[in-house]
Amino acid sequence: MLDTRELPLLRALAGRYPTTEAALSEIGHLRAILSLPKGTVHVVSDVHGEHRKLKHIINNASGSLRPLVERVFGDRLTAAEERALLSAVYYPRERYARVASHSEGARWAFLIWTLAREVEVIRALSLRYTLRQVEAAFPEDMRGLLRELVSARATLGEGGYLDALLDPFVQHGREIEILRATARAIRNLTVFELVVAGDLGDRGPRLDKVIEYLMRQPRVRVVWGNHDVSWMGASLGQEALIATVVRLSLRYGRLSQLEEGFGISVAPLDRLARTAYADDPAERFAVRGEGLRDALLMARMQKAAAVLQFKLEGQLCRRRPEYALEHRCLLHRIDARAGTVAIDGEVFPLLDARFPTLDPGDPYALTPDEAACVALLKESFLRSPALSRQMRWMVQQGTTWLRRDRALIFHGCVPVDGEGELLPFVVDGEVRRGRALFDALERTVRRAFRAGAQEDVDMLWYLWTGPLSPMFGKDRMTTFESYFVADERTHRETKNPYFHLIHDAAFCGRVCREFGVDEERGLIVNGHVPVRVERGESPIKASRRAVTIDGAFSEAYGDKGYTLVLEASGARLAQHHHFTSVEQAVEAGEDIIPVISDVEVYEAERRVGDTEKGEEIEREIELLERLIEAYRDGALLEQPR
């Protein structure tokens, strides 16, 4: 019996499917999708601003395009031809530039040779998709042309119909657009979805270019990490986070992402460094990288930003006592005359006791010059259209956790105690644990961008550094100690017990159950904590139910990285190595050929119907069945066109 309360929803659905036949056709299409092998999902993490390496890994589908080409062509291509074809798929513009100055005949020969082989690859990939899905993978402006190329039985280069389709592009010097479209179609069909498990920026050169390239991909989801929420909070004007991201940009010599990428001027900090820190050697603040500014000036700017960060964090901790982070405010524990600081009841000598802007009576107060600097930086962050656009995309495409078939993906940890019991944290006045905590924090982040309440914006700072933040998961962030104290005991950041417990299969099963993932076969996927392979660590934990894919992607931390490949046949881990340059990839055919290891091989191929996407499709089918019932009962009238 049709529930009349459903009618508004069904009436809206009727706009898309105005007849019974239209609804039945869509049901058939959806049921066909359920029977297909599930799409390949690639999961990467902790990119940390390495835009060139990320672009290559996306372009070569984490190394899976090379074996695909080998399977399609067998021994029909020489090694040189295979490299030429792959470079045209990875970098069509740069590859074509090598022949752009040649004669029209040579350009035509290159176009036909490349297109014929790319079309063959597309046809092979199309076998795993419906026709509608294949066409959706084609760039919209070129959809009709690619449809003809892929479906035609004629051969390119033999004259006639297909060559006539291409001829106008050659005449107008636009053949590169065809090559770009086919290359993109291959990449889109090879990887159904890209998931980035957090920490897109900091350390590496350009966060802005990382996000810009991700924004151009067809299907991307982001699981927020603590470095992501720091930039998100800074874009909303959270002052402690503004100081933090500026300090980190200076620490790694990455001012170009601020100044060129986001149009944010650091001139106010430059002025503060030249005045308040004019004679400061700032030896503890040497820049890890190169920049256009004088190295000593950048060190002084970094110190000025660090002191601003510590002051603003102290103000925030006093404003938000519920965070229970008062013990991490250390400026009032400095004895400037003795050159010491008290930490956890023990006194340590300071490596640098020059604090020209510190008032012993009110150490967290900003001087007038500091207040002016913060105000100008804040205005610059709030007025950056590029930063706002990219951070709002991060909110739109982002989440605190994600399920993909049997994989449970989140950046850091589920906060637990030593026994593996879920730890409580109060959000919106209610105690939350486990999945409820993740979901409540996600609502807070979205509300911060929607309404901008200071309480919500401040929560992004806690997510960056708080012990019960699922994105951080350590007892403390020892930034002050690493700058100012030699004793390495004070530098220690103790990880949440979660990171040890994921070696236990039973614990992993409980975590999966908490998030509605298969308790017996679920796989936990994290980033955040770099895998130190040189120390004998493995990304695949002893439980074989958890994998950490922070492989030190950035040059500053190892220049490796992992992609977890979730295929219909199983889960595999691809370990990447150093990427030299686009020029080497095009000129010499250099590639990142990953080392592949199996995480799990499935007994039977996983279908779309076995996954969470299948559950969504089943709900769509149920709604369409209700629409057909409404047409049959006369509750809604069909509207044949």
Curated annotation (Swiss-Prot):
EC number: 3.1.3.11
Cofactor(s) required for function per UniProt: Mn(2+)
Pathway: Carbohydrate biosynthesis; gluconeogenesis
Pfam families for this protein: FBPase_2 (PF06874)
GO molecular function: fructose 1,6-bisphosphate 1-phosphatase activity
Alphabetical list of InterPro entries matching this protein: FBPtase_class3, Metallo-depent_PP-like
Domain of life: Bacteria
Keyword DNA-binding attached: no
Catalytic activity: beta-D-fructose 1,6-bisphosphate + H2O = beta-D-fructose 6-phosphate + phosphate
A Gene Ontology BP annotation from the UniProt entry: gluconeogenesis
Keyword Methyltransferase attached: no
Keywords for the protein's UniProt record, in alphabetical order: Carbohydrate metabolism, Hydrolase, Manganese
Family: Belongs to the FBPase class 3 family.
Protein name: Fructose-1,6-bisphosphatase class 3
Organism: Sorangium cellulosum (strain So ce56)
Organism taxonomic ancestry: Bacteria, Pseudomonadati, Myxococcota, Polyangia, Polyangiales
